[in-house]
């Protein structure tokens, strides 16, 4: 099937140019040949227009396609063949009651229920351990349901949604330029990712051309943010298996990364760096040289601790 691709991200597309497929034709698309970026519904009267954004990693191109279904209707679940649709289909069903028939795990994504149907393991030697939603200090509240056999964890199911803020609706009201800070606040450790997506949206719609240097600096901030998240996850894994020295080491290395971000724009999480049409800070040469030294040390330290951790 020929899917019209756009040349790159941050490229405006008129709604009337987005192809609309009949649902049977839509479900026949070989989605396993692409990476699923987005799958969401937009109400149109008593129907919902479902947009799907796909990326082709071999060509670095994006496409956007759509289909239209009535609210409270049904279609054959895409998750059965393409697991990447798993959460997207659950959210679509939760919001619009469009049922993906055959979905293997059709549970609410955000709705909190006293009788939530957690996965269970039956057996005389199994037991459940419930953790949260109030736990662990600074991270988002979540309920973790462990099924265990002795000290062995058989399964873990996580339920979030306790602090759903309705961010999408907040974006619909007020001055669009004031939403930059809101975009930074969608996810605390991904501030640069959120604001880069939002500013990229405004810049592409406004046909604003961003200087090459500014683009490179944004990419650098995104990579620092990504590295900090990955290193933090490695530290969390080490802590979960009681490898305390590893957890401490990863935490110390992560601090070097976020302190480098702070040297660029005054905030360890990159808040305030990305502006609309340009960046709000400029990275001076002497700061860049220090950053290079920091990142070389980070690489050496991560290689050393990971060699021990995964041996």
Regions found by a protein language model. Name each.
Residues 1-26, 30, 39-46, 50-71, ...:
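Active-site bordering "gate/hinge" segments
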């Amino acid at each position: 099937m020929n899917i019209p691709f756009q040349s790159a991200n941050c490229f405006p597309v008129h709604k009337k140019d987005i192809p609309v497929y009949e649902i049977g034709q839509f479900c026949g698309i070989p989605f396993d040949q692409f990476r699923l970026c987005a799958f969401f519904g937009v109400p149109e009267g008593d129907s919902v227009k479902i947009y799907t954004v796909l990326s082709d990693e071999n060509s670095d191109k994006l496409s956007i396609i759509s289909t239209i279904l009535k609210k409270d209707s049904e279609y054959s679940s895409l998750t059965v063949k393409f697991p990447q649709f798993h959460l997207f289909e659950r959210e679509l069903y939760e919001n619009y009651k469009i049922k993906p028939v055959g979905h293997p795990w059709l549970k609410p994504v955000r709705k909190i229920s006293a009788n939530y149907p957690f996965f269970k393991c039956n057996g005389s030697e199994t037991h459940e351990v419930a953790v949260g939603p109030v736990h662990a200090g600074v991270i988002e509240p979540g309920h973790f349901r462990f099924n265990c056999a002795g000290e062995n964890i058989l399964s873990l199911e996580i339920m979030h949604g306790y602090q759903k803020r309705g961010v999408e609706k907040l974006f619909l009201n007020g001055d669009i330029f004031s939403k930059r800070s809101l975009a930074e606040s969608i996810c605390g450790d991904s501030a640069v990712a959120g604001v880069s997506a939002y500013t990229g949206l405004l810049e592409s719609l406004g046909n604003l051309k961003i200087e090459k240097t500014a683009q490179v600096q944004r990419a650098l901030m995104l990579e620092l943010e990504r590295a900090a998240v990955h290193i933090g996850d490695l530290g969390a894994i080490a802590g979960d298996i009681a490898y305390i020295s590893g957890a401490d080491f990863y935490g110390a290395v992560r601090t070097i990364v976020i302190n480098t971000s702070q040297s660029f724009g005054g905030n360890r999480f990159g808040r305030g760096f990305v502006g609309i049409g340009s960046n709000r800070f400029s990275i001076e040469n002497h700061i860049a040289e220090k950053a290079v030294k920091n990142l070389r040390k980070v690489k050496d330290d991560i290689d050393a601790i990971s060699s021990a951790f995964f041996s």
